[in-house]
Design a protein with these regions (language model features):
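Conserved small/polar residues in nucleotide/adenosyl-binding loops
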Residues: 1-9, 231-235
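Residues marking helix boundaries in flexible regions
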Residues: 11-13
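Catalytic-core segments of class I nucleotidyltransferases/pyrophosphorylases
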Residues: 142, 154-159, 163-167, 194-234
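Structural motif
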Residues: 20-22, 67-68, 114-115, 140-142, ...
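N-terminal glycine-rich phosphate-binding loop and ensuing alpha1 helix
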Residues: 16-100, 114, 155-157, 161
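Conserved beta-loop-beta/alpha segment of the NTase-like Rossmann-fold superfamily
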Residues: 88-90, 103-194
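Short loop/turn motifs at secondary-structure junctions
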Residues: 1, 17, 63-64, 137, ...
Length: 235
């Protein structure tokens, strides 16, 4: 009986350790027009690869094992990018283009899977996250907004630290970044009793959306990285 209780405790703990990430990519990208008219904004090249690959790499480096794309019918190229293309791989093999072959087969590590779910209507971020509920189930998860690329050269990235904190405390986490005081009216700003040190966390009392300059509770802006469960969302 004691061993059954212990097993149950392990099962519950594993259930609430984050291994899944939701990436909402169904938006039409109107801010990126006219480029996004034919190319999804997430597929716009940054240096030498699509922007969304950097976000997926960030998630994988943080220990994520399943990427859930909440997508739209116009975003098939995103799904295709993370899928295997055996015809292309065979062609590269025949032409002995080994470097290119290695590059495309390593876009997604073998231990990581990508699944897609459609968001039938553009009803916002909360709705996009709910669209993935059947896949996530009762597990905790991360949400990464692909509009934001987080530059992080540390051995353990900020997302990994945030997920680690969630796994220990089971308290919802939101990643923030300090912005100049005169720009607070362009962001969602968190209300905290005291600003946390870099890489640390602090209790949050609320979020003020685009407060007027001079009225913001802090200069810490939300940057599109969350660690939560559907229990938190129901609350």
């Amino acid at each position: 009986a004691a061993s059954d209780v212990y097993k149950r405790q392990i099962e519950i703990r594993l259930k609430y350790m984050i291994k899944k990430a939701i990436l909402p990519v169904a938006g039409l990208g109107t801010r990126f027009l006219p480029a996004s008219k034919s190319i999804p904004k997430e597929m716009v090249t940054v240096v030498d690869r699509p922007a969304i690959e950097y976000v997926v790499r960030e998630a994988v480096a943080a220990g994520i094992e399943q990427i859930i794309l909440v997508t739209h019918s116009s975003k098939a190229s995103i799904e295709n990018y993370f899928d295997r293309n055996f015809e292309l791989e065979t062609t590269l093999e025949q032409k002995q283009k080994w470097d290119l072959l290695k590059e495309i087969t390593e876009i997604l590590p073998p231990q990581v899977s990508v699944v897609s779910v459609r968001q039938p209507q553009p009803l916002g971020l909360g709705h996009a996250v709910l669209c993935a509920k059947d896949i996530v189930g009762d597990e905790a998860f991360a949400v990464l907004l692909p509009d934001v690329l987080v530059k992080d050269q540390a051995e353990k990235n900020d997302l990994a630290l945030m997920i680690e904190r969630f796994n220990v405390t089971q308290a919802a986490q939101i990643m923030v970044e300090a912005v100049p005081e005169h720009l607070v009216d362009q962001y969602g700003i968190v209300d905290v009793a005291a600003a946390p040190a870099e890489g640390q966390s602090a209790a949050m009392q609320g979020i003020v959306e685009k407060p007027a300059v001079g009225t913001a509770p802090s200069n810490l802006s939300v940057i599109g990285r969350y660690a939560v469960s559907y229990t938190h969302l129901r609350a």
